[in-house]
Amino acid sequence: MAEALPEAGRYFCHSCTAEIIPRLPEYTCPRCDSGFIEELPETRNSENNSSNNSGTDQNRPSFENLESAQFTLPSGYGQVTFGIFNEGLDFPIFGTSGPVEEPRDGESRREHQSRQRYGARQPRARLSTRRAAGRNEGVPTLEGIIQQLVNGIIAPTAMSNLGVGPWGVLHSNPMDYAWGANGLDTIITQLLNQFENTGPPPADTEKIQALPTIQITEEHVGSGLECPVCKEDYTVGESVRQLPCNHLFHNDCIIPWLEQHDTCPVCRKSLSGQNTATNPPGLTEMTFSSSSTSSSSSTSPTDENNAANNS
């Protein structure tokens, strides 16, 4: 009894890397005439698969005819179209892997691996405007992330509406991240700006004008005094301003500071007169004043009593 020719099934040519119908009875590739082909098992129930495919094909994007992807901008900006990436840059569809299939009845391990490798191939898209069937709702797609970034750059006020679209959500506002080479510098600048005008209030104009002006003497120069602001040494006969804490400053150095802060740049004491009787460290043995009466006021009560008894 003559043996009937087997029916040509689904085969995969490793030379052409494509699914083919082999040339019988040689079982060779009709394209390259190579015999390096592998049989792909048929599906268990073709009828069920045909009905399922008819329902899922409506939700599956056509990747072969996809030329561009349009993203809707905020109100008043229209739409923007992103072109196709390079052929070598393709992205798998998020969430289409599904659960791992178990080997079917009567199927060898090699046939199962072959079916997993070639029979269950999924299309790979460069950009898609439709949601793939069975995708996890919590996984954002590439076009969804681009859409949110476009919205955040053009209309930051519309970022409160993120998460209500069909593309999934990011974990937070994209504008809260450091984007680009200058992103970190921008964040540091914003943090530093938050500390502006958080110190003491400006000093009163009357108190600033009432600060005494004294002349630098050889005693000052010999002690190595310098302006704490500009770090320049004082010269004999130079006019400087003296704060209640006895610290000396150039007039052009201390006035702009006091117009913004009611404190001494060195000891942080205010001009209100609090704790101004105590000289700061380093000036305890040296008292600078604008009048000659300060030397007489330093006489102790004990010396006065001794002078009275001697008389």
Curated annotation (Swiss-Prot):
EC top class, as a word: transferase
Phylogenetic classification of the source organism: Eukaryota, Metazoa, Chordata, Craniata, Vertebrata
Domain of life: Eukaryota
Function in brief: E3 ubiquitin-protein ligase that mediates ubiquitination oF target proteins. Depending on the associated E2 ligase, mediates 'Lys-27'-, 'Lys-29'-, 'Lys-48'- and/or 'Lys-63'-linked polyubiquitination of substrates. Part of a BAG6-dependent quality control process ensuring that proteins of the secretory pathway that are mislocalized to the cytosol are degraded by the proteasome. Probably acts by providing the ubiquitin ligase activity associated with the BAG6 complex and be responsible for ubiquitination of the hydrophobic mislocalized proteins and their targeting to the proteasome.
Molecular function via GO: ubiquitin protein ligase activity; zinc ion binding
ZnF C4-type: positions: 13-32
Biased composition (Basic residues): 123-133
Protein name from the UniProt record: E3 ubiquitin-protein ligase RNF126
Zinc finger boundaries on the chain: RING-type: 227-268
InterPro entries: RNF126-like_zinc-ribbon, RNF126_RING-H2, Znf_RING, Znf_RING/FYVE/PHD
Organism: Xenopus tropicalis (Western clawed frog)
Example of a GO cellular component annotation carried by this entry: cytoplasm
Bias type Polar residues, positions: 301-311
